[in-house]
């Protein structure tokens, strides 16, 4: 056996193997079948390629390039001379003041935005729902129940989110940025000085800007612009970046503050070319990554030192292509936004009517900031003005509402007052109608009462005897007209009384039994007493206590109110004068006429004196037992001052112009008063003699008789010796004279009816002596001399022309007066009232004439 190794694998000498040749199979090329599918649709377009290229580019190249340039400038400034170091420090502090504070503020706002976004993610999202629920009719709670916020929100607000955490700057990050920004100790010292200088106040910065650094700032801006121009000439512009996806654009809509912050970090006005704003949006979305890359670059100084040639190449090639265009695009976006704000402000100013300010030319970041701040100030001012105007409108509305409420209250009050006045007016009209009905009934009853009143029926026999005696006198005398003394009641009264009998009267009258031998009261009145009357003054009666005697008698007749008490002064005077008339001699006609004139005036005066003049009127009658001359003198002396006061009234308001007429009128009125008193005394004594059995009357008449009898026995003892023959002659003479006076008075009345047509003013206080009478004018003509006593006052017209004139004047004045007849209850004696007192009473109270109106 052999131990030699034999190489079995080696080639055999002399033996050669031929390799096997494989045959290639020829492949048959098939043609492209377009009918199956077209893959060119899925091929990327040039726009997609550009977009993919921009997506994969680094987003921090511009920021890194700007920081590298800043470091290069710092090294360059550090190598310069020391005297220029201070200038460069100041220049850098100005740049830091402009840019760094704004960067810090934007960083804080960005942090706060992220913190708020993180806080919102802690809570569940809620959506507003609108349930289709029918609410119960009586339920006070709404259909949607509002749930309270969960407890986690309050806990989060108290613990996590603090007010200072939103606006404070993170000190650690700021410290790392400032500590790693330099390459050596000099750079650290420079950064510290810049940080210390950047903390200056804004006011100091503005002051330095305006006073010291204006030239430095202008030089700085010119240097920067020259560098930008040279870089733009060396490198062509880069390709624009494509648009981002829709999701990134939606995310960018909520990052407006971050976009503005990044735009302000770029250098202003580096080029005039435009660039799409998608780069800015992408930078905002990757702001966290940019900061991390920036910190990594600052933390590697060795790497930064080794890459100096690369850095120079970046500044020379690609960076110079991208940076100017992108910064210019950002400035254009900012400028466009500022212009939009200005345009909106202009539209708002035009809409509100304010002064429109033009667009301000903005150069660089300072111009943008100034325009933005000015727009913000204007907007705040406009908001303030609108708020003030709104407050004024609210105050004006409140005032108008208050005024409206006051006006509504006034309208309500006026409406209530009008309704109340309507009710009062209706009630007043009802009372007026009732009063008119009652007044008509009382007038009818009054007419019936005048016809049936037995007041002076006891004068019938005296009138019959007087008519019998005067009938013969009148037939014998040539001057006396034929006038019947017994004038009956006018036809008007008779018709009215006939139409209303006693059973149909609304007011029952007090029936007094008349004696069978007495006649009616109204038949004793002459026709002129019943003449129609017109009210010349409006009714102004203030008191119900002051009535004329005839009104009192008529009121007692219709049972309305008892009559006031009447003093028996006139009857006492008349009965006292009867004995004086017996004692006085009847010698001559002149003496009789003077006495009758005097007595007429005195009697007319005495009947109007009243209670105040009662003592004055009784004083002259005590002296009537003396001779005629003494009585004339005493009466004239006592009456002269009284007549001097009433001369204008007796003369119907006409003032006397001469002293002679004044004296003559005093004498005439004195004589008339004396004659009237004598006539009254004789008439009273004649009644006592003719009717010895006594007259029917009230207690006042009997009292007057007793007083007059006692006065006669004490004062006139000589009167018992007179013969009845002389008395009858005297009575007949007096009756004749009274009939003559009555006839003349009737003639005067007829003349007034026929001739006088001129009417006096209705409100005239002065009574005219002769008043016209027409049937259509309804004038009141009343005679103050009644039918029973008028003949005694007629002697004044038969003796002397002076006395005749006075009698006519007095009769005319009394016939035109509107005062009623003065009557005493039960006695039937009527005396005229004082014209002066009558006119004053008309002026004060007003007076209704009680005579009948002729239609």
Swiss-Prot record:
Residues 314-328, 794-828 have a biased composition (Polar residues). One of its GO terms (cellular component) is centriole. Keywords: Cell cycle, Cell division, Coiled coil, Cytoplasm, Cytoskeleton, Mitosis, Phosphoprotein. It comes from the Eukaryota. One of its GO terms (biological process) is metaphase chromosome alignment. Residues 300-311 have a biased composition (Basic residues). The modification Phosphoserine is found at residues 640, 644, 760, 764, 819. InterPro entries: SPICE1. Regulator required for centriole duplication, for proper bipolar spindle formation and chromosome congression in mitosis. This is Spindle and centriole-associated protein 1. It comes from Pongo abelii. The lineage of its organism: Eukaryota, Metazoa, Chordata, Craniata, Vertebrata. The gene is SPICE1.
